[in-house]
Amino acid sequence: MCDFTEDQTAEFKEAFQLFDRTGDGKILYSQCGDVMRALGQNPTNAEVLKVLGNPKSDEMNVKVLDFEHFLPMLQTVAKNKDQGTYEDYVEGLRVFDKEGNGTVMGAEIRHVLVTLGEKMTEEEVEMLVAGHEDSNGCINYEAFVRHILSG
């Protein structure tokens, strides 16, 4: 069922164990998406919930899973090719480039990230845009997307 190599699986298990706060070889359901993202995947919150079997929100910080159950979920997410590409993200941000100079206002990016789609918190957005704004409050969106996709 699993298409990962032995080396990949060992690397994934090592990362999984970093999220194991109690040392029992398990992580909380609420950590599953973070582990997947740490391993280079980019699932939406909805995708994570789907592979977890759509648990109730109050179960997310109670239910746990071990690596043997996590790995097939990671495989499912890795096979999903509906993830956006560099070009997709740049094209999406180009809509906000009113002057056609390759930059967008940082305030606009902040607004979009906290209000649309999978909403981020203001703290998450600040961490994401930190160091990308120029003296005019503009962000070069191509460099911004490259930075985000590079992990």
From Swiss-Prot:
Gene3D superfamilies per UniProt: EF-hand (1.10.238.10)
Entry GO CC: brush border; cytosol; extracellular exosome; membrane; myosin complex; myosin II complex; unconventional myosin complex; vesicle
GO molecular function: calcium ion binding; cytoskeletal motor activity; microfilament motor activity; structural constituent of muscle
Keywords, ordered alphabetically: Acetylation, Motor protein, Muscle protein, Myosin, Phosphoprotein, Repeat
Annotated positions of the N6-acetyllysine modification: 81
Residue positions where N-acetylcysteine is found in the record: 2
Modification Phosphoserine occurs at: 57
Transmembrane domains' residue ranges: none
Domain EF-hand: 7-42, 84-119, 119-151
GO biological process, one term: skeletal muscle tissue development
PANTHER family: MYOSIN LIGHT CHAIN 1, 3 (PTHR23048), MYOSIN LIGHT POLYPEPTIDE 6 (PTHR23048:SF43)
SUBUNIT field: Myosin is a hexamer of 2 heavy chains and 4 light chains. Interacts with SPATA6.
Purpose of the protein: Regulatory light chain of myosin. Does not bind calcium.
Name of the protein this chain belongs to: Myosin light polypeptide 6
